[in-house]
């Protein structure tokens, strides 16, 4: 079993209990006009030091009040299931603009129903296929 704790601080996710992580603040995305209007962080957290296994994650701050907001952990898994599904197709702060494909980068827009309206959101992948 693997255990690590999360401690949320202003503007960043801090991982404890010997978990090593690397992260990057994402300020823009292809297909989204302008800077992102929310705090999006991506990175890897080490889950098996001996074998060098890491999990990729997206972290999005809540619109509802930072550290006092509820914390939601969304884990995807299984063959052909990307953590991007949760971020852009299900509960995340942006979604694809539905329009006929014209050969360019798909456009993105903010999701008015994002769960980040009420909670801090950590999305990660834990599945049976290689990522």
List each model region and its residues:
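Catalytic-loop region of hydrolases
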Residues: 1-71
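N-terminal cap/lid subdomain of alpha/beta-hydrolase-fold enzymes
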Residues: 58-131
């Amino acid at each position: 079993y693997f255990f690590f704790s999360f401690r949320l601080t202003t503007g960043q996710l801090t991982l404890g209990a010997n978990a090593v992580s690397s992260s990057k603040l994402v300020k823009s995305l292809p297909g989204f006009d302008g800077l992102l209007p929310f705090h999006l962080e991506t990175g890897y957290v080490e889950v098996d030091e001996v074998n060098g296994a890491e999990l990729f994650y997206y972290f999005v701050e809540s619109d509802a009040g930072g550290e006092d907001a509820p914390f939601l952990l969304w884990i995807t898994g299984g063959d052909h299931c990307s953590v991007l599904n949760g971020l852009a197709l299900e509960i995340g702060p942006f979604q694809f603009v539905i329009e006929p494909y014209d050969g360019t980068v798909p456009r993105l827009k903010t999701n008015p129903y994002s769960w980040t309206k009420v909670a801090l959101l950590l999305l990660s992948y834990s599945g049976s296929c290689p990522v």
